[in-house]
Amino acid sequence: MKALIKRYPDYGIWMEDVPMPEVGVNDVLIKVKKAAICGTDLHMYKWDAWSQAHCKPPYTMGHEFVGEVVEIGPGVRNIKVGERVTAEGHIVCGHCRNCRRGMGHVCENTISVGIMGKDGCFAEYVTIPESNVVKLNPAIPDDFAAIMDPFGNATHTALAFPLLGEDVLITGAGLIGTMAAGICRYAGAKHVVVTDINEMRLDIAKKMGATLTVNGAKGETVEWAMQKLGIKGFDVGLEMSGAPAAFNDMIEHMYKGANIAQLGILPADTQVNWSDVIFNALTIKGITGRRMWETWYQMEQMLLGGLDLSPVITHRFKFDDFQKGFDVMVSGQCGKVLLEME
């Protein structure tokens, strides 16, 4: 079968013919229909410092997909051949302290599909443990099913705190930030302001329901947005950028007693004015992955309730044209990029 392999510890990714994956005990073999390129895939493609520290080539990349079950291994009880599925990309042990207290998303022994320890879905076929396979409601289209993984990150972050009637500041208009804007509006936020320096991505944020967008590259400021909306601060902050300046700008413009959900990965040497955090009684909550399985139930219900993710999907390429997909990701002038196997 064809697969995209991170063959060497170097810039790039390579298409190769590889053997079909073996179907082991409790495994489900899935024929991939569509896969999506993630920001993490871009890190591995570039072979940056994070990838060098966490990933060990060779391996098949990819962890966002939708497909059809074509074979089940011994022990599989609840998944049937022919079912349309996606998967939770974090394979957890189920036995560590965190798993046993209902916090599998921070399992001490996590294996990440297509990243660390398990070949991924940038291939014609992929095996996933039954415990991680997610059956899909027929009303959820393939395009949305293929991006449930990052939609889950956005959902986990956006719903970390109550939103109904609240003013929300989102720093970072990447895929997760723009989806979070839609979630916030769906959940009843009063105003949603999104900041970034990429006008194309801010346009996507507007399509997803942002009340106002702030482009720092044009000299626009959060203060300008607050003045225009007639507000003096924000109740909820969703930090998606990982940019120290954006994080500190957020802290400066929160109401006292406000809440911040932090998904963006800040540099280790980030300087923070902790006095503002302490004396303004701010709560900062770190976010990783998706809660298993509450986040998945929330995602499904929002999609069935009419939340439209189509504005975030900007490019589609055939699997053989994967290089075009990675090129547009490198350019930054895109939302979500899909690779279509069929």
Predicted region positions:
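N-terminal glycine-rich cofactor-binding segment
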Residues: 3-22, 39-71, 86, 107-119
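Glycine-rich beta-strand-centered segment in the early N-terminal region that forms part
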Residues: 21-35, 50-97, 137-139
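NAD(P)H dinucleotide-binding glycine-rich loop of Rossmann-like/cofactor-binding domains
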Residues: 93-171
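Mid-domain Rossmann-like dinucleotide-binding core that forms the NAD(H)/NADP(H) cofactor-binding site
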Residues: 138-218, 223
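C-terminal substrate-binding/catalytic core of Rossmann-like NAD(P)-dependent dehydrogenases/reductases
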Residues: 223-227, 231, 267-315, 323-324, ...
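Glycine-centered, small-residue-biased loops immediately flanking beta-strands
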Residues: 258-259
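Acidic carboxylate diad motif detector
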Residues: 263-264
